[in-house]
């Protein structure tokens, strides 16, 4: 791309300039493409080509056909197994986010993870089980509704594809923002085994082993085991030990039965458990005590003094914490799934069945500081799900190609929420003169049970009008039923009211009713929707393809299963998304350069977001509709092989995400959360304006000792994200600064199957935040930190 966007005085390109720059690719690509060579044979999903100065074709299966990614009229970023290995020290999707622009994952625990694409999805905040996810996560075709899956270890990954925009006519579960499609390696009838050991600083150890081979002539097996451990990245000054450690194990058993060329059955069972002293926030700043109107409130240091607590110095990147109560996370997960594929007359009929069980067993320090205010804040969760999908894919190479499917999904979560209060709670929360016994030992215990039944029929057809022109239409019908139970009671071992001094009894009754309210209700909802897709794609030449599309996405209504307070509605209206895409995909310079660009314009009506009601104590996290959100921008994907051995990739996104209509936003901290604020026209939360990811790799054939062939290689990666607001009300104290991270790796690979490398992530030890939250109750800003510099070595063996 030779045309540079016009710049503002401060260096930020205007939206109009970006549109013009991206649009300029269309005619240029059409002119250049006619002079290029004919299509080369497609290769398997692979990120580079060290043997020739040309970019390998990327073959993706997003539409359930093996297709050259350049001809698929969808904005896709794909990572292959070799590219994942080259990143070094990377083991989960949250870390891979750095290489997937437009994707943003925030959170601090296995349960509280939120995901957005282009600013649309689920914003940061306490996870609410009554809220559907806007980004679909699929592993081998099975939908994973729990966002905590994003931070678990990835095993046997063959490819990861990020599809942007609504995908309801392709996938079983409807999604409004896009989909993350993860595919794993099938069992092989040729015996093979893989082994990997990585060691690094912070006592990092990752050991992986996998064997695959035939049991009989038509039955193959793959068994894999992964161990991942690391000491903590933070030092707890109270417990005198390091926290935020990893203690993970994952097992996977895969069977492939293939009696004929026309039928195969794959059955997979997996189990993983993640453990550690993790899931906490650090204090990043102290909130001012003087508000915008000049009023003064009790601040963090005054409250701390009232209970005899001496806080640590505010220095988040010293990575010191003083949590004084036990904190741990246990996250076991297991599942069984089967996929049967029949091929009859060129048609493929697939059946995908899956049952999964996910549990979150935490014990959290409720206040996340060294005072004994909230001694416990947990949501013990058991989530189970079942899904069944039937899908028919028509033969390739026909004038009309189509996919049609039926889908059923059920999930239920069984949550037990506990908030317990300690000896400092009364003085901190109520006033310095209150006796400790007013709240000490009090606990609020709530049983929350949301359940969903989802039924859908979907289809998508492509009509090849001419060899160079295709029209695609898709339609989806969704019907969903939701139920919910919320049952809160008083628990704990607080002193009886009658045993308190008479002067405090009335105040204690009010305080306990506030912090441990009794409430019970049930709710149910049902509704349906029709959504769809229209697109056209045109071959400007053999090596240049343009497309335009419109799609409607839908996310069903939500149920607020929280303590009911003023302003909190039980039901949240469904979310509807209209998405427009205009893109071009090109191969240039005799296939040494692959350059793709697309413009997007997305309008999200009734955007569902996490709110925090801080006008009540304790604060209540709930979901509500913000109004209308608009996301528009430009995305760029490029791969290049300038000369033999050198490969480069670049993915970049400019996203202007704003609230178009948001007149009733929660007020911000400096206004004491009084009233509402009109944020119409303001930046949407969780949406960095700029995201960039780039990699560079050079490999050179060498002769090893003993005469064996091999190659030496070196590579680097770069990621940048600009600032964004973490809070839905754009509170200035939730502004997450932009950051950039570099990685480096290099090694030697033998033709005999071994590979030894060294690597570093966050090479220059960039200090950055993943997310920030405003905690007015404690008078502080809390956040989660990006990982510090990590480095190590890896040995891989493949046979």
Question: Where do the protein language model's features map onto the residues?
Answer:
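Acidic, small-polar-rich N-terminal luminal/periplasmic segments of exported/outer-membrane proteins
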Residues: 53-190, 582
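N-terminal Sec signal peptide and the immediately downstream disordered periplasmic leader
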Residues: 1-90, 94-99, 261-262, 336, ...
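Short loop/turn motifs that connect adjacent beta-strands in outer-membrane beta-barrel proteins
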Residues: 127-131, 187-192, 216-218, 262, ...
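Gram-negative outer-membrane beta-barrel transporters
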Residues: 402, 467, 471, 596, ...
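Solvent-exposed loop segments that connect transmembrane elements
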Residues: 233-242, 279-322, 365-376, 418-447, ...
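C-terminal beta-signal and adjacent terminal beta-strands/loops
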Residues: 4, 603, 719-727, 748-799
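Membrane-embedded beta-barrel scaffold of Gram-negative outer-membrane proteins
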Residues: 339-364, 539-555, 571-634, 639-641, ...
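Outer-membrane beta-barrel translocator/receptor signature
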Residues: 132-134, 146, 155-164, 169-237, ...
């Amino acid at each position: 791309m030779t045309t540079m966007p016009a710049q503002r005085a401060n260096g930020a390109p205007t939206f109009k300039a970006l549109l013009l720059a991206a649009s300029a690719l269309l005619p240029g690509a059409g002119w250049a493409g006619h002079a290029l060579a004919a299509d080369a044979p497609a290769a398997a999903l692979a990120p580079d080509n060290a043997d020739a100065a040309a970019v390998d074709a990327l073959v993706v299966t997003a539409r359930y056909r093996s297709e050259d990614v350049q001809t698929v009229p969808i904005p896709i970023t794909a990572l292959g197994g070799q590219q994942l290995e080259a990143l070094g020290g990377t083991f989960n999707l949250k870390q891979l986010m750095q290489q997937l622009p437009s994707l943003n994952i925030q959170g601090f625990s296995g349960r509280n993870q939120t995901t957005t694409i282009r600013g649309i999805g689920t914003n940061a905040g306490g996870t609410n089980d009554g809220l559907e996810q806007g980004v679909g996560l699929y592993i081998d075709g099975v939908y994973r509704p729990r966002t905590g899956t994003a931070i678990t270890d990835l095993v046997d990954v063959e490819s990861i594809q990020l599809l942007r925009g609504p995908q309801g006519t392709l996938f079983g579960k409807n999604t409004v923002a896009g989909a993350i499609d993860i595919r794993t390696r099938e069992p092989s009838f040729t015996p093979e085994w893989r082994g990997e050991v990585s060691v690094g600083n912070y006592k990092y150890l990752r050991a992986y082993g996998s064997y695959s081979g035939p049991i009989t002539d038509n039955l193959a097996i793959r068994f894999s085991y992964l161990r991942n451990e690391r000491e903590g990245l933070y030092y707890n000054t109270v417990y005198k030990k390091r926290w935020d450690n990893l203690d993970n194990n994952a097992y996977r058993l895969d069977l492939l039965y293939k009696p004929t060329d026309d039928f195969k059955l794959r059955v997979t069972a997996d189990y993983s458990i993640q453990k550690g002293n993790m899931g906490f926030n650090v204090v990043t700043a102290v909130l001012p005590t003087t508000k915008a109107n000049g009023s003064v409130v009790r601040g963090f240091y005054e409250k701390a003094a009232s209970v005899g607590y001496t806080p640590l110095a505010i220095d988040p990147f010293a990575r010191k914490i003083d949590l004084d109560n036990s904190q741990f996370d246990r996250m076991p997960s297991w599942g069984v799934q089967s996929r049967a594929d029949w091929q009859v007359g060129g048609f493929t009929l697939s059946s995908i069945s899956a049952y999964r069980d996910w549990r979150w067993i935490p014990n959290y320090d409720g206040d996340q500081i060294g005072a004994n205010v909230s001694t416990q804040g947990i949501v013990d969760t058991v989530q189970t799900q079942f899904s069944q999908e039937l899908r028919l894919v028509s033969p390739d190479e026909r004038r009309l190609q189509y996919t049609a499917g039926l889908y059923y999904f059920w999930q239920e979560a069984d949550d037990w929420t506990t908030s317990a209060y300690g000896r400092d709670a009364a003085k901190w929360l109520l006033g310095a003169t209150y006796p400790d016994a007013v709240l000490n030992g009090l606990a609020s215990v709530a049983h929350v049970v949301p359940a969903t039944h989802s039924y859908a029929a979907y289809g998508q057809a492509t009509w090849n009008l001419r060899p160079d022109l295709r029209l695609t239409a898709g339609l989806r019908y969704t019907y969903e039923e939701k139920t919910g139970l919320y049952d809160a009671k008083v628990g704990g071992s607080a002193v009886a009211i009658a045993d308190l001094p008479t002067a405090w009894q009335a105040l204690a009754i009010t305080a306990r009713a506030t912090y441990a309210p009794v409430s019970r209700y049930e709710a149910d909802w049902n509704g349906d929707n029709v959504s769809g897709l229209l697109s056209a794609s045109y071959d400007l030449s053999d090596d240049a393809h343009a497309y335009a599309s419109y799609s409607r996405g839908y996310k069903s209504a939500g149920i607020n299963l929280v303590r009911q307070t003023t302003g909190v509605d039980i039901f949240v209206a469904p979310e509807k998304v209209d998405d427009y895409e205009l893109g071009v995909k090109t191969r240039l310079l005799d296939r040494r350069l692959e350059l793709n660009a697309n413009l997007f314009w997305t309008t999200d009506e009734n955007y569902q977001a996490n709110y925090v009601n801080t006008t009540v104590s304790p604060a209540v996290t709930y979901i509500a509709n913000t109004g209308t959100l608009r996301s528009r921008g430009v995305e760029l994907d490029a791969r290049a092989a300038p000369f033999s051995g050198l490969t480069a990739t670049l993915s970049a996104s400019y996203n202007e995400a704003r609230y178009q209509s948001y007149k009733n936003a929660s007020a911000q901290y400096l206004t004491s959360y009084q009233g509402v604020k009109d944020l119409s026209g303001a930046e949407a939360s969780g949406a960095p304006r700029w995201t960039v990811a780039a990699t560079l790799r050079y490999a050179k054939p060498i002769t090893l000792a003993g005469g064996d062939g091999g190659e030496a290689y070196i590579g680097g990666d770069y990621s940048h994200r600009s600032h964004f607001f973490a809070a839905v009300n754009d509170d200035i104290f939730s502004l997450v600064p932009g950051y950039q991270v570099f990685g480096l790796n290099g090694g030697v690979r033998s033709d005999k199957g071994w590979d030894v490398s060294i690597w570093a992530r966050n090479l220059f030890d960039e200090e950055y935040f993943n997310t920030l939250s405003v905690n007015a109750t404690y008078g502080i800003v809390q956040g989660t930190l990006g990982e510090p510099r990590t480095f190590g070595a890896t040995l891989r063996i493949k046979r």
